[in-house]
Amino acid sequence: MARIVGVELPGNKKCFVALTYLYGVGRTRAFEILKNTGINPDKRVKDLTDEEVSKITKFIQDHYKVEGELRTDINRNIKRLIDIGCYRGFRHKLGLPVRGQRTRSNARTRKGPRPSRIKTKKKKEQTV
């Protein structure tokens, strides 16, 4: 198993699949990284040499934001939107969809589960 940017990549996977385990790297970016470093995408991670691993690591660090740095940037951007009080920041703060989706009938993921209603049973009047 190779360690790239602080993440252990599974050794039995092909390089392009294993690189997608990094936060911020999808299939397209993985192929781009391997193309620029000159490594065969179908090569297994366990077959990579130390030199190839360091090549990939250096390329990623020089050209992309991944893992913690990317997460920090995203959180900082959301916090900035909230601080300036814009509409998008307000939607983030309320936990509602930010990009104009409807909320009357959908958006359950963002809004969370429906509030449960408390059902009260009526006492039956006893006739004596």
UniProtKB/Swiss-Prot annotation:
One of its GO terms (cellular component) is small ribosomal subunit. GO terms for molecular function: rRNA binding; structural constituent of ribosome; tRNA binding. The keyword rRNA-binding applies. The keyword Protein transport does not apply. Coiled coil: none annotated. Residues 97-128 are annotated as: Disordered. Residues 101-128 have a biased composition (Basic residues). It holds the Pfam family Ribosomal_S13. GO terms for biological process: translation. Keywords: Ribonucleoprotein, Ribosomal protein, RNA-binding, rRNA-binding, tRNA-binding. Located at the top of the head of the 30S subunit, it contacts several helices of the 16S rRNA. In the 70S ribosome it contacts the 23S rRNA (bridge B1a) and protein L5 of the 50S subunit (bridge B1b), connecting the 2 subunits; these bridges are implicated in subunit movement. Contacts the tRNAs in the A and P-sites. Belongs to the universal ribosomal protein uS13 family. Part of the 30S ribosomal subunit. Forms a loose heterodimer with protein S19. Forms two bridges to the 50S subunit in the 70S ribosome. This is Small ribosomal subunit protein uS13. It comes from Pseudothermotoga lettingae (strain ATCC BAA-301 / DSM 14385 / NBRC 107922 / TMO). The gene is rpsM.
